[in-house]
């Protein structure tokens, strides 16, 4: 509107050419974003587009390995990516993630300092590459009635329920699903055996491989979204990320099928993993300017709260908590207690030889070797 007032005296043709140029410029503002499926508020992207006049091409992926492969191959085509901070740490070392211009991210002030410190100490020295998004842990989501109906002696609350072949053999009758995520399951298995979740000892991976081989015949599927089908009694047990367990419980209530789901964390010191997912900008991103604008927008407390209310994941945004539904903030599945967090472990970047060991262990597990 201001432009047309300034140039009221020019010819109609000139005004039209300016309008066309402005329209083309607006259309040129395209931001390409990728994230896990169902991991953002329902209106978050639309509201960003409406406010800033930027078209967002939003893509989803279903495994950390798939986005890793795209980023490592180069020319991913993305301007903004959500990734597990532990996995992304090695991408940073490889120069695949761009440093952030924090002068354009004034909303970093809303992020929990404890989480920023966690990132700096474990994965992103100096907090130069990552904007924390969500955090949480993993555990077991289960249909208690179906479990006990199938196997009255099931050790509910113990990780033996999923790692002991004697128990798994019985529970296979009502369906057991594992996360399709070696970065979660392999450290979980190491911890269950009382070993270092970040072990670099080949013998430890042999022990894990042997344990997983014994339970493999009883794993129905490897699926990060199996929790969505638990209200239909397709599975009685599933390893899930904590908030997905909460979503499963809510889904069961909404489905009104009479199914009641519960969730538990691995108990004991160093047996549950603390993870943080972060926003980051690939080094080959074409639109870094608007990528920073998007990250700053995502850190608004009300936006972060909307994302948590939809996904039921714990936001890293400290100032968003007053806007988040109590149903979410009061659940240990979504927001583990401080006592639980203190006992959790974090994963670190492993040497390439150990990464290959982990990959081989996982591949053999899924293949039943």
Task: Give the location of each predicted region.
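Conserved C-terminal helix/tail region of periplasmic/extracytoplasmic solute-binding proteins
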Residues: 338-369
């Amino acid at each position: 509107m201001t432009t047309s007032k300034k140039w009221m005296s020019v010819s109609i043709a000139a005004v039209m050419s300016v309008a066309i140029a402005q329209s083309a410029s607006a259309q040129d503002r395209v931001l390409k974003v990728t994230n896990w499926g169902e991991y953002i508020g329902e209106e978050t992207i639309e509201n960003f587009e409406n406010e800033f006049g930027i078209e967002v091409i939003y893509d989803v992926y279903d495994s950390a390995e798939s986005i890793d492969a795209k980023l490592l191959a180069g020319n991913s085509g993305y301007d903004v990516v959500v990734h597990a901070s532990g996995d992304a740490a090695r991408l940073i070392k490889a120069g695949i993630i761009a440093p952030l211009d924090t002068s354009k991210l004034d909303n970093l002030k809303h992020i929990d300092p404890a989480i920023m410190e966690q990132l700096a100490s474990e994965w992103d020295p100096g907090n130069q590459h990552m904007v924390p998004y969500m955090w949480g842990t993993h555990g077991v989501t289960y249909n208690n009635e179906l479990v006990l109906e199938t196997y009255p002696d099931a050790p509910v609350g113990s990780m033996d329920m999923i790692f002991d072949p004697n128990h798994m053999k019985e529970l296979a009758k009502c369906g057991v699903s594992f996360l399709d995520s070696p970065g979660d399951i392999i450290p979980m298995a190491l911890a269950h055996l009382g070993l270092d979740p970040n072990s670099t000892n080949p013998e430890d991976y042999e022990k894990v491989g042997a344990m997983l081989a014994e339970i493999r015949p009883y794993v129905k599927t490897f699926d990060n979204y199996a929790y969505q089908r638990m209200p239909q009694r397709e599975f009685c047990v599933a390893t899930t990320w904590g908030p997905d367990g909460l979503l499963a419980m809510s889904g069961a209530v909404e489905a009104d099928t009479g199914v009641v789901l519960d969730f538990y964390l691995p108990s004991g010191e160093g047996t549950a993993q603390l993870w943080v997912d972060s926003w980051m900008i690939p080094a080959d991103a074409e639109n870094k300017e608007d990528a920073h604008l998007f990250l700053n927008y995502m850190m608004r407390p009300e936006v972060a709260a909307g994302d948590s209310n939809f996904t039921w994941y714990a936001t890293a945004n400290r100032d968003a908590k007053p806007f988040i539904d109590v149903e979410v903030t009061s659940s240990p599945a979504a927001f583990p207690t401080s006592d639980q967090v203190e006992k959790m472990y974090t994963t670190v970047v492993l040497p390439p030889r150990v990464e290959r060991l982990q990959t081989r262990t996982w591949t053999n597990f899924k293949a039943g070797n």
